[in-house]
Amino acid sequence: MKPEVFYKTLADQGIQLTDQQKHQFHRYFQLLVEWNEKINLTAITEESEVYLKHFYDSIAPLLQGHIQNEPLRLLDIGAGAGFPSLPMKIIFPQLDVTIIDSLNKRINFLHLLAEELELEGVHFYHGRAEDFAQDKNFRAQFDLVTARAVARMQILSELTIPYLKLHGKLIALKASSAEDELTQAKNALNLLFAKVIENHDYTLPNGDPRTLTIVEKKKETPNKFPRKAGMPNKRPL
């Protein structure tokens, strides 16, 4: 997907990018490739692949109408090089985006990226999702949490649901169908007082399969969740 095709595909779906937004995506691509030689950010570095499999893939929740250009607080867990939240932030600048990542080198990249792209209302923190979720400045403070190919729902739900406000939503992007995952996650979702409200498969323009799952927080999360760092992975709920 060449940049021009990316712009046209968005325009066809009602999103007209400004010259500034086009420049932001172009600079994002350049910095991603440049920094990828120093630290491992992505295996995808060819321009048309980055525009398709990182930029276009990341904005599926926008294209499908799940996120609007409103001053919502969005947390991205394990965003790596900023996906999916920063492409969404470029298109919908009103979003207030927070990223937590366990690797400090990636956080350094994100700080530089945000400065270069002149993004405002973005916040980056180095650490584990399990730890920040017990901090009152983070717990139950977000309207939305996004996660792209981070972990199975059984694990992901414990890492993310505590951050949501009541009736806030987790938006999980996956590369394959999530049906089996959701069956395995039933117990975790029950314990966390959360419910799957949408789950559907779709394809990228090149035919690659994708799944988008939305989980809503129905009641306050019990204080014991999430458990200590490493436990959700070691012993899923």
UniProtKB/Swiss-Prot annotation:
Subcellular location: Cytoplasm
UniProtKB keywords: Cytoplasm, Methyltransferase, rRNA processing, S-adenosyl-L-methionine, Transferase
Protein name according to UniProt: Ribosomal RNA small subunit methyltransferase G
EC number: 2.1.1.-
Keyword Transferase included in the entry's annotation: yes
Cited Pfam families: GidB (PF02527)
InterPro entries: rRNA_ssu_MeTfrase_G (IPR003682), SAM-dependent_MTases_sf (IPR029063)
Record flagged with keyword Cell membrane: no
MF terms in GO: rRNA (guanine-N7-)-methyltransferase activity
Enzyme class label: transferase
GO CC annotation, single: cytosol
Spans annotated as Disordered: 218-237
Residues binding S-adenosyl-L-methionine, per UniProt: 78, 83, 129-130, 148
Source superkingdom: Bacteria
NCBIfam families given in the database record: rsmG_gidB (TIGR00138)
Protein role: Specifically methylates the N7 position of a guanine in 16S rRNA.
